[in-house]
Amino acid sequence: MTREKLLYLETFGCQMNVSDSEKIAALLKGIGYFPTQDSSQADLVILNTCSVRAKAEEKVYNHLVQYKGLKRKKPGIILGVGGCVAQQEGERLLANVPHLDIVFGTHNLHLLPELVRAAEKGERLAEVGFIDNETRLDLFPVDERTDGVSRFVTVMQGCENFCSYCIVPYVRGREISRRSADILGEVRGMAGNGVKEVTLLGQNVNSYGLKSSGEMSFIALLREVSLIPGIERIRFTTSHPKDFSQPLIDCFAEIPKLCRHIHLPAQSGSNAVLAAMNRGYTREEYLGSIARLKAACPSIQITGDIIVGFPGETEEDFQATLSLMEEVRYTDVFSFIYSKRPETKAAGYADEVGQDEKQGRLSRLLDLQRRITLETNKSFVGTVQQVLIEGESRRGGQFYGRTSGNRVVNLAADVSLVGSIVNVMITRGDQNSLQGELCR
């Protein structure tokens, strides 16, 4: 009997990459590769990569060095790299990494089965061409998994904002929206398999449908998804603050299934830095959107992204960022030290902030956010929250779930409750999660 072939798939970076990895796994299952958690047992290793920051890119190259030894022990193993590093480097990756077999870009996932078949015959190939056609976003097997209660659904890909620091437009391409009929069909299929929560994904979901003649708007898409039986919660990410309209804000008050959480990246609280970043809004405009959002939905939980040490950022600029964080009261912030990215406008900016200063500012920012997060989590103690139970917690004998506001809750529960939304009394607020008890 022939042994089934094994796939080890490692994902770096954002939720879009997580979604892409799910597609990769489904495609490769179609040609006989099944997942393993042990890379040493794999016949095929795929790294789905991120290049949004230099540190993420360095991590990929470090992993490729580690796989050189595995390739030596198992010469027949196939090693592939996809995602944003692959899109950025293309043929150079094959030239610089002799033990690499396949390079495929962000627009070429659907070609992966034939690339693997070619690699099985000893060929080394790179496919990184952009395909400006929405049909490529639907060239994937139907998701037939019955595990998990929460899924990602890609609604669009690409970005045309060209923030001065950001490589995404260069590695994900121009904005392309999927057909709404295909999106709704995918969500209906997921609902039929027991999925209760979907997260609609795009680099800038606000732009959904704007370039597609006759296609519905993102707001209309949200409303259509909310009508699908079985889907009890809807999330979306990411929104660009300059496009965050009042009609979209109103959806948080008008669509009961839309979760009370929004990820709205500010990147900085300084108008001078925001202008240099080409963000397209001011501090005042951002805070105005936050105020309107809180007025429409007082229970909204807000997360964001912050970059520290952008070229020319002064101590005064940094203090403006800290004061913005205090005013918004983010429940979490993803914060990063600025790093130059190839092809971006900011890569040519002078007035670099020193590395020690960057690190010091990041530490101060993290200290502030930890305080705000802990205060926020403690404020939930004594309240009853609706929690979607997702699975077993790493804490022995407990399960975990999320509130509508995206706070993780650990609690004693029964496996029969996985996939159910239950009322939970919050008994403790910790730094990274909440502790609760089922309301009987």
Swiss-Prot record:
The keyword Transcription regulation does not apply. Binds 2 [4Fe-4S] clusters. One cluster is coordinated with 3 cysteines and an exchangeable S-adenosyl-L-methionine. Transmembrane segments: none annotated. InterPro entries: Elp3/MiaA/NifB-like_rSAM, Methylthiotransferase, Methylthiotransferase_CS, Methylthiotransferase_N, Methylthiotransferase_N_sf, MiaB_methiolase, rSAM, rSAM_horseshoe. Keywords: 4Fe-4S, Cytoplasm, Iron, Iron-sulfur, Metal-binding, S-adenosyl-L-methionine, Transferase, tRNA processing. Residues 5-121 form the MTTase N-terminal domain. Its EC number is 2.8.4.3. Its main location: cytoplasm. The keyword Signal does not apply. One of its GO terms (molecular function) is 4 iron, 4 sulfur cluster binding. It catalyses: N(6)-dimethylallyladenosine(37) in tRNA + (sulfur carrier)-SH + AH2 + 2 S-adenosyl-L-methionine = 2-methylsulfanyl-N(6)-dimethylallyladenosine(37) in tRNA + (sulfur carrier)-H + 5'-deoxyadenosine + L-methionine + A + S-adenosyl-L-homocysteine + 2 H(+). [4Fe-4S] cluster 2 binds at C159, C163, C166. [4Fe-4S] cluster 1 binds at C14, C50, C84. It is found in: Cytoplasm. Monomer. NCBIfam families: miaB-methiolase (TIGR01574), MiaB/RimO family radical SAM methylthiotransferase (TIGR00089). Catalyzes the methylthiolation of N6-(dimethylallyl)adenosine (i(6)A), leading to the formation of 2-methylthio-N6-(dimethylallyl)adenosine (ms(2)i(6)A) at position 37 in tRNAs that read codons beginning with uridine. This is tRNA-2-methylthio-N(6)-dimethylallyladenosine synthase. It comes from Geotalea uraniireducens (strain Rf4).
